[in-house]
Structure formats: structure tokens, C-alpha cells
Swiss-Prot record:
A zinc finger (C2H2-type) spans 222-244, 250-272, 278-300, 306-328, 334-356, 362-384, 390-412, 418-440, 446-468, 474-496, 502-524, 530-552, 558-580, 586-608, 614-636. Has transcriptional repression activity, partially through the recruitment of the corepressor TRIM28 but also has repression activity independently of this interaction. Essential during embryonic development, where it acts as a direct repressor of a placental-specific transcript of IGF2 in early development and regulates convergent extension movements required for axis elongation and tissue morphogenesis in all germ layers. Also important for normal morphogenesis of extraembryonic tissues including the yolk sac, extraembryonic mesoderm and placenta. One of its GO terms (molecular function) is transcription cis-regulatory region binding. It comes from Homo sapiens (Human). SMART domains: KRAB, ZnF_C2H2. This is Zinc finger protein 568. The keyword Nucleus applies. InterPro entries: KRAB, KRAB_dom_sf, Znf_C2H2_sf, Znf_C2H2_type.
Length: 644
């Protein structure tokens, strides 16, 4: 832990140094602008370059670092470069940044570098190698980088003096031209990057030490045949080719999951051990990787440094920005080899592939239930612990999942970001829009295996299946009546309480169910949006249309177990069964008379209350029953009631 703390501490110093340098950069830019306006002859301040703010490591240091320390190094380097680009510094992307973005190792062992690159040049004895290492080895302490400007090597072929650039923070002297190469050399370390074609020309500097001059300049000689990506080291190309080949030599002994990089395996193994060494000092949440902690901190600070150039939406993580940009481009580069389905994110493809393999490597320690995703295990564990870490600051309600919390917040804000392209109706949840779209497409993907009836929603199928099993788990404590759904029980209990929370804004009539209010309002509007494709008849309720369509198909899926009579509606079967049982569950509290149907009780109650809700629009006469109004209207139209 001491070594790790040292690296983290030193890296923090480096980030603080970057902060100071960025302040200096902004100040320098302002001063330069003022100098131009005032035509001051003062020498302008020098531009901050990537090398001024970078964090450098030797190859030896890189090999000795733990995976968490390497991840920290990657985060710091990438953020430093991003900040430079953000403030407008026109910098060419360094090779090390290119590698880090591809999640490749930025360095290899010095022995490999000497052995792989320019073997004709670097076959020198041990004494010369030590002298060369003295020239190119960097300062080992990250926090003690120094700027070396001492000129110690002279190339006699081109009559140029090269500085010993022993740190990534180099001299401000940009490039050094070599006439024989017709190329520019940034610093002496570039000599190590030449491939074949080098000419071994032994020169001597002012200290009498050997110095070799190269006659060719190839920085990235290794190219991937699959995607064309360039690499300066063959070892890096070999590692990269594993991505295309699908090679994953590092396998987890716990769950069998394989990785192309050893450090990724080490990080993964912490999932099984539960090790989370990096803890947030704000909320106490712990993480497996330091980079995850750094990203998490942005939740508390609100920092979102990555902005979309198309819509200017900002993100706390660069990966989220990259994924977001695919919304604008429509790019889905990750394709499933089994079914051809494409995804905009690689992680989604990986999770999708588990559907085909059936892989569920993550098991709950409490109940043994297995999951394909680690995040699913985390959420599942909260069902055992009762943990609800996401609390609404509006109403105090807490949630176990962040996604559910976000959806809940929309009930306060009224936000409905998911809009139907067919009718313009908006929804707060993506799943609600998906289900709604089936109204337009008539898609019913969920089919009952018992009777073949199909549904657009899975929950409707589950509810329907209880009809076949006879399961009614929700029982009324007042009358003992049982229901398939909890929502049906809640609505039923309003019969006992007399509660009618849904009132019509036109006539003031109240209802115990919202659906009844919606149906009632269509009386005022005359709206009948549901049309039969067979005969064109229109209905104000979708359910009525569905029942009507059974007339054309002759479908009668609900059969009486007593007499075998079949019905098109389950409600009709329920009423019919009462003719066998003699059940009359609806009793008048005025006179004690009982009825087998709720509608008959309602009509009967009007004899006590005198209510006559059905009024003739011709003469104003009112009736207690709709059927009576229909018969009465025939007197105005001259239509005669046919008796068969």
C-alpha cells in the first residue's frame, strides 16, 4: 500500500501541477492578447504544450505498477490532454495518448525496445548500453520532473546540437531538422523509435561518448491489416491484433471469463473477492478502480467536462459522450454474430451475447440466483438488504435503483421525453412508449399457451393466465370476494366505501374508476375512436371493439365447466356460472334484495333514489335505464320494435 499511496500521491501532485499550468495558460493568453492590442514590445509568453503538463513514466516503472496505478496513470494523462484541447491549444495527438485511448500499454520494457528496434544500430556492448541508458533514462520520481536544457550531444553530420530530453517536459525548442533525413526530431528519445533502414554512423559528442546517427525516420512502422491503425512497437501491434482475433489468453479461475489484457483480469478478480480499496470521502462509496472513483467524484462536484458538439449536452465521462454522439450519427458498430443485431455500445453487445450462450456468471450469495450482469446482482442484493440509496428530495420517497428514481422524478417535473412518432403522445418511460406503439402496429408478442390469446403486454398475459389456473390471491376483507389483480381489489373496495375520486369536469358526475370516467367523457364528446375493420362499426371503448370482433370470428374461448356453454367474454361466463350456483353477491342496502349482476343492482338502486340519467334529447323525458331510452326514441323516429 505504501508504493500505491506514493504513486497516487505523486499523481495528485501532477494533477495539481496541471491546474497551475492551465491557470498560467489562460493568463498567458490574456496577456498575449493585451500585448497585441497595446503593441507592446515585450516578448510574448510561451505556449503551454502537452509535454509541459504530461505525467511521464519509465518502462521499468510501468512494469512495476499495479493495475489500479496504471488506470490512474491513464486517467491523468487523458484528462491532461483533454484539458489542453479544451482551452484551444492546437496540439498534435501524441503517440502515448493514441495508445492510451486504445487501452494499450504506453511503454514496453527497455530490453524489448533495444532488441526489437534498429538491431543493426543498437547491438552495442554493455558499457555503451549503460552510457546510452544514462542519456535516455528518465527521472524515476514522477513528482520531481525537471526541465533539462543542457546541450550535450552534437550530430556532426548535420552540424546540429541536440539536447538530452530526459523528461517528457522537454525544451521549448520544438523540432530539430536533420538535412540528411529531411525530417524533424523532437528529442533524442526518437532515436529509439527507428525501425530498419538505420545507418550505423558512430559519432562522438563533446564528452567523448559514442552517439549513433540514424538515416531514416519511421515513427509508426507497424500497421494493423484489419483496421489500418499504426503502432510504433511490434509488441503493441500484437496486443492490438487480439481485439480482431478475439484472443483472450487471461482467464478467471472463478467464473471462466477471459480477457485480452492481464490487468483487466486482475481488476475483474476483485469482483469475486469483493475488494474495493478506493473510497469516496463524500458519501463513503467504494470502488474497485481509482479511475472509477475519479469519475464518481464528478457526481458530487457536478463537473461535466465532455460536451457534444452537435447539441452541447455535457457528460462527466468521455465514454458517455462517445456513446451519445452515436445518437446523432446513428452508428451501431457492434454486431452480434449469432442474430445480426447491432448495438451502439460494445457493453450492450457483450450483455446481448449472453442471451445466446445462456451465461450467468454472477450468483447471489444469499439465495444462489444467477445473473448475466454484475449490476443485476447488485440490484438484486438490495432485495435482501432492503437498501434504497436513491432518495427523492421532493417527497422523500426512496428507491433501490437509480433508473427508477430518475423515472420517479419525472412525476414531479412532468417531463415526458419519449414521444410517439405516430400520434404525438408523450411518455415518461421508454418502455411505455414501446407498449403504446403496439396499439398502432397491432403487435401482440405475448401468447397464452392454453387458449392462444395474444397480448401486447407481458403483465397482461400473466394476469390472463390466472383465469386458467383459477388463482385469485387478492381477497376483500369486507365480503370475501377474491380477485386476480390487486388493482381490481382496490377498485372493488370503493363499492364498500362509496369512494368516487374521479369526477367529470363537464357534468360533475363522479366515478370510482378512472377508466369509467374516461368512457363517460366520450358521451360529451361523442368520440368513438375504435373502428371495426370488418363492418366499420365504431366504439368509444377499445374493449367493446375487441368483444365486437368476436362476433365476426365466432370466437368463444371461455367455456362453462358445468354445462359446456361457451362465451366470448370472461365476464359473461362469470355471470352464467351464477345461474348454476345461485350466487347473488350484490345486495341492496335499502330493501335487502340481492342480484347476480352489479349492473342490475345499480338499476335497482335508481328505484330508491329516483335517478334517471338517460334523457331524451328530443322531448327531455328521462329514464332510469338506457334500454328504456332506446325504446322511447323509436316513438320519435317512427321505427317499430320488431318482435320475433
Amino acid at each position: 500500500m505504501t508504493s500505491q499511496s506514493s504513486v497516487i500521491s505523486n499523481s495528485c501532485v501532477t494533477m495539481e501541477r496541471l491546474s497551475h499550468m492551465m491557470e498560467r495558460k489562460a493568463w498567458c493568453s490574456q496577456e498575449s492578447a493585451l500585448s497585441e492590442e497595446e503593441e507592446d514590445t515585450t516578448r510574448p509568453l510561451e505556449t503551454v504544450t502537452f509535454k509541459d503538463v504530461a505525467v511521464d513514466l519509465t518502462q521499468e516503472e510501468w512494469e512495476q505498477m499495479k493495475p489500479a496505478q496504471r488506470n490512474l496513470y491513464r486517467d491523468v494523462m487523458l484528462e491532461n490532454y483533454s484539458n489542453l484541447v479544451t482551452v484551444g491549444c492546437q496540439v498534435t495527438k501524441p503517440d502515448v495518448i493514441f495508445k492510451l485511448e486504445q487501452e494499450e500499454e504506453p511503454w514496453v520494457m527497455e530490453e524489448e525496445m533495444f532488441g526489437r528496434h534498429c538491431p543493426e544500430v543498437w547491438e552495442v556492448d554493455e558499457q555503451i548500453k549503460k552510457q546510452q541508458e544514462t542519456l535516455v533514462r528518465k527521472v524515476t520520481s514522477i513528482s520531481k520532473k525537471i526541465l533539462i536544457k543542457e546541450k550535450v550531444i552534437e550530430c556532426k553530420k548535420v552540424a546540429k546540437i541536440f539536447p538530452l530530453s530526459s523528461d517528457i517536459v522537454t525544451s521549448r525548442q520544438s523540432f530539430y531538422d536533420c538535412d540528411s533525413l529531411d525530417k524533424g526530431l523532437e528529442h533524442n528519445l526518437d532515436l529509439l523509435r527507428y525501425e530498419k533502414g538505420c545507418v550505423r554512423e558512430k559519432q562522438s559528442n563533446e564528452f567523448g561518448k559514442p552517439f549513433y546517427h540514424c538515416a531514416s525516420y519511421v515513427v509508426t512502422p507497424f500497421k494493423c491489416n484489419q483496421c489500418g491503425q499504426d503502432f510504433s512497437h511490434k509488441f503493441d501491434l500484437i496486443r492490438h491484433e487480439r481485439i480482431h482475433a478475439g484472443e483472450k489468453p487471461y482467464e478467471c479461475k472463478e467464473c471462466g471469463k477471459a480477457f485480452s489484457r492481464k490487468e483487466n483480469l486482475i481488476t475483474h478478480q476483485k469482483i469475486h473477492t469483493g475488494e474495493k480499496p478506493y473510497k469516496c470521502n463524500e458519501c463513503g462509496k467504494a470502488f474497485i478502480q481509482m479511475s472509477n472513483l475519479i469519475r464518481h467524484h464528478r457526481i458530487h462536484t457536478g463537473e461535466k467536462p465532455y460536451a457534444c458538439k452537435d447539441c452541447w449536452k455535457a457528460f462527466s465521462q468521455k465514454s458517455n459522450l462517445i456513446e451519445h454522439e452515436r445518437i446523432h450519427t446513428g452508428e451501431k458498430p457492434y454486431e452480434c454474430k449469432e442474430c445480426g443485431k447491432s448495438f451502439s455500445q460494445k457493453q450492450n453487445l457483450i450483455e446481448h451475447e449472453k442471451i445466446h450462450t445462456g451465461e450467468k456468471p454472477y450468483a447471489c450469495n444469499e439465495c444462489g440466483r444467477a445473473f448475466s450482469r454484475m449490476s443485476s446482482v447488485t440490484l438484486h442484493m438490495r432485495s435482501h438488504t432492503g437498501e434504497k440509496p436513491y432518495k427523492c428530495n421532493k417527497c422523500g420517497k426512496a428507491f433501490s435503483q437509480c433508473s427508477v428514481f430518475i423515472i420517479h422524478m419525472r412525476s414531479h417535473t412532468g417531463e415526458k421525453p419519449y414521444v410517439c412518432s405516430e400520434c404525438g403522445k408523450a411518455f415518461s418511460q421508454s418502455s411505455s412508449l414501446t407498449v403504446h406503439m403496439r396499439n398502432h402496429t397491432a403487435e401482440k408478442p405475448y401468447e397464452c399457451k392454453e387458449c392462444g390469446k395474444a397480448f401486447s403486454r407481458k403483465e397482461n398475459l400473466i394476469t390472463h393466465q390466472k383465469i386458467h389456473t383459477g388463482e385469485k390471491p387478492y381477497e376483500c376483507s369486507e365480503c370475501g370476494k377474491a380477485f386476480i389483480q390487486m388493482s381490481n381489489l382496490i377498485r372493488h373496495q370503493r363499492i364498500h366505501t362509496g369512494e368516487k375520486p374521479y369526477a367529470c369536469t363537464v357534468c360533475g358526475k363522479a366515478f370510482s374508476q378512472k377508466s369509467n370516467l374516461t368512457e363517460h367523457e366520450k358521451i360529451h364528446t361523442g368520440e368513438k375512436p375504435y373502428h371495426c375493420n370488418q363492418c366499420g362499426k365504431a366504439f368509444s371503448q377499445r374493449q367493446n371493439l375487441l368483444e365486437h370482433e368476436k362476433i365476426h370470428t365466432g370466437e368463444k374461448p371461455f367455456k362453462c365447466n358445468e354445462c359446456g356453454k361457451a362465451f366470448s367474454r370472461i365476464s359473461s361466463l362469470t355471470l352464467h356460472v351464477r345461474s348454476h350456483t345461485g350466487e347473488k353477491p350484490y345486495e341492496c342496502n335499502k330493501c335487502g334484495k340481492a342480484f347476480s349482476q352489479c349492473s342490475l343492482l345499480i338499476i335497482h338502486m335508481r328505484s330508491h333514489t329516483g335517478e334517471k340519467p338517460f334523457e331524451c334529447n328530443e322531448c327531455g323525458k328521462a329514464f332510469s335505464q338506457r334500454a328504456s331510452l332506446s325504446i322511447h326514441k323509436r316513438g320519435h323516429t317512427g321505427e317499430r320494435h320488431q318482435v320475433y
